[in-house]
Amino acid sequence: MILVLVMQNKFKRKDFLKLALLTNLALMAKPLEVFSEKFADLNFPSSNDNVRYFKKGDADYNLLRKGFNKRIDKFPLIIALCKNTAGVTEAVKYAKQNGLPVAIKSGGHCMEGFSCNDGGMVINLSLLNKIEWIDANNIKVGPGCTLSNIYDEIIPQGKMLPGGSCAGVGIGGLTLGGGYGLLARKFGLTCDSLQEITMVDGKGNTINSANDKELLWACRGGGNGNFGVITEMKFKLFKAPAWLQSYRFKSYKVDTKKAKTVLQKWFQVTANLPTGCFSAFVLNRKTIYILLTNVDKHNAAVQKVVDTLSALTEKTTKTKPQPITTALKVFYGRSEPLYFKNASAGLYKNFADIEACIDKTIDTVIATPGMIYQVNTLGGNIENVEAEKVSAFPHRVFTYFSELQTYWDFPKQEAPLLQKFEQVQMLFIGNGIKTQYRNYPDINFKNWSDMYYGANFLRLQQIKNKYDPENIIRHEQSIKAR
């Protein structure tokens, strides 16, 4: 059976209201500043059934330009809200003809706002949100589908696509940068399930990866805003786990010595974590929070982890196994945009990788309100050798991924928090942590090409040369043609 979920054929006002709800962008519009005179040199494109264009001053412009991170405030010259591949083609050709850089937005969750720009064109893919069943084990989706859209469609059919836990994230950006989550250790990265893509390249040509396996390789972990605009993605699916059980372990009022001891022991106990399990260590000021989830049968190996972490911390909370749909929604997270910075703080093989700098890191986190240091388990089927051969994601040898986060309520709090944030990042980099996850970018990474892509960068650059030699598709850390 082929089931297609589509938006209405014609653009209507209510479509944009729905879009606001789906992408969590229903924000108060700020007063408009005087915009660039650049339009004096352009013929503003006409909207049609394939694409609708917006400029500053239009009713939906502010709604469409904003993303999940309120820290990012950019003003594109034109927003192209595309309905299909033809609309994307038209928008890219217009941008190319008029020398406008193109940023691509599916869910708007890029940590550094690379899905928007100042003075260029943003191609908004929110309406490319079809889900089509090819057969019982494969689907085609538009890049504008959010994770919750996909989960709500496939889990009732007993199927799973390993993705993240944040409901509003777009499948396009998640996949193109790798894509990990609670089920990655069991099923692999999101990009490992990617079978085929359709893309409009920087020349305005429509390309299908069935005719270019090198392009598919690149889009499995190396494709974020680099080569073109993805308009369709084909994924293989797995049998969905029936249940998910979670455990939460907490310690309070910890000092640096205690936090370091718990973290070191957590590394040891998770080194041989069962494949169906995921764990995260979280330090939020003086509180330690450890999450453990399991989608396989509870056995002695899982119980050993539970017992060790319980003995190490002060409070253990155990949930009964829940249906996978219900359990995942617990982790969907906040839907409203907020002020924050969240970036990769390195990929590790073990505690020894950070031992030299972890004391100062913990000192800073404990002393800084709003700052969080988190380490997540990788490994399991992410380390799949066959997947490594056919994907650009370069970090499978690492079994842990860390992230640094900081949050605030008012703009005046931003500068001192970002200063502390950068201090911690420099601690890691100064102690040899130089491998980073592209889906959690940091605008301050200097050698980002090596950090994100490693030895694969030159190969990715060759693909950029082929599909976008004029560098039309670009952002602050996109791969540039040579």
Which residue ranges define each predicted feature?
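Soluble FAD-dependent oxygen oxidases
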Residues: I2-R482
